[in-house]
Amino acid sequence: FMFDFIVVGGGSAGCVLANRLGEDPSVRILVLEAGGSEKSVIVDMPSALSIPMNTRRYNWGMKSEPEPGLDGREVNLPRGRGLGGSSSINGMCWVRGNPMDYELWEALGADGWRWSNVLPYFQRLEAVQGGGPLRGTNGPVKINKGLQTNPLYEAFISAGVEAGYARSRNMNELQHEGFGPMEMNVGNGLRMSAARAYLRPAMARGNVKVITGAVVDRVVFDGKRATGVHFSVDSQTQDAKASREVILSAGSIMSPTILKRSGIGPAA
């Protein structure tokens, strides 16, 4: 295989990268995903969210080492397995970070991460109906507040207000603190995972190839330049080459694992 870009991991980041890179029709992109397809009613259906979260087909089921401060208990570390990654198994809660958090990141040295820098990207990715000037309306990820018809919904918010907390009309605008309705990345009754919002449209263009069940062993180098990856599908080993870049987007646990197997970082 020879491609311009190889994206290792078809999760939340990998789906977006494949979409954006694939906007150039002259570029060929390979996406390698260790899990399978996200096309399943239990992934699509918001009310079934606990099923993929607790199914090894969709969740790697990782755990921490025993924690001394928790009486030796192991902590679950949910990691999405399959196209869309953790966006295919999470709770679909659409809540931006507080603007002051981003300002603090900038103050601590994370150049380019202040609120005014990240806001355009929040706006670019979302499609909100009836939102304010801080919201996006034409993005690929559909956002809504649900039906909100259960009387307990309003009772819970009213109880918070009665206890002295502010009422927030929308926690993704200026009033973050307090009680209010929560938005969800759900469109037409279906989970808006990164695979649905970004990868599927990219695949339809014809210049993005996706291989599922592809377990990447290591990155291949020519000197200090990454030139490809060594991976296996159904225990059959294969190699893929990239003329421009190899992108690791396999998550916070598996990306460094692949790097270590590739001879980068501290010895295992």
What are these regions (language model features)?
Residues 10, 15, 116, 197, ...:
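Structural detector for helix-capping/boundary residues
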Residues 15-19, 196, 256, 260:
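Short, hydrophobic alpha-helix immediately C-terminal to the catalytic nucleophile
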Residues 39, 107-226, 232:
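Conserved redox-cofactor binding core of oxidoreductases
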